[in-house]
A protein has these predicted regions:
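Short, well-structured N-terminal submotif of metal-dependent ribonuclease cores
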Residues: 1-39, 51-64, 117
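Acidic catalytic patch
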Residues: 17, 67-90
Length: 129
């Protein structure tokens, strides 16, 4: 069983049939059914923005889908924040949210699944959809 840290791009694509990466995200999460899928708390916030704009029913649907997919929400603590800051300082092209996901993959010894091919230059753990 693998450990996977999921970037927001994967989950946004999964929930958005019109997204260019939708089919890849659905296929990847189906293959991950027996894996430990980890979502950083900051990623949870990112993927809930649109449902909150739509309304409470949309939020409930996304949260139910995450539960059905057995997603584990991982907190952002001081150690993770420091590692993300270090990554952001040395890789200025990535955003802080992206650095948090990459830092979590390192911290948890997990694969990092994303739609961002550029992340492959930052960590050997990155797997692009």
């Amino acid at each position: 069983m693998a450990r996977l840290v999921l970037d927001a791009s994967v989950l946004i694509a999964y929930f958005s049939p019109l997204d260019a990466h939708h089919a890849s995200a659905v296929a990847r999460l189906r293959r991950a059914s027996r894996d430990d899928c980890i979502v950083i708390a900051s990623v949870l916030a990112e993927i809930l923005v649109h449902p909150y704009r739509v309304g409470p029913k949309a939020v409930s649907e996304v949260e139910a889908a995450l539960a059905a997919l057995r997603m584990v929400i991982h907190p952002v603590d001081a150690g993770l924040a420091r590692r993300a800051a270090e990554l952001r300082a040395s890789h200025t092209a990535i955003r802080l949210g992206d650095a948090l996901v990459i830092a979590a993959g390192d911290e948890l010894d997990a694969e990092i699944v994303t739609a961002a091919a550029s992340w492959s230059r930052i960590s050997r753990r990155v797997r692009v959809l």
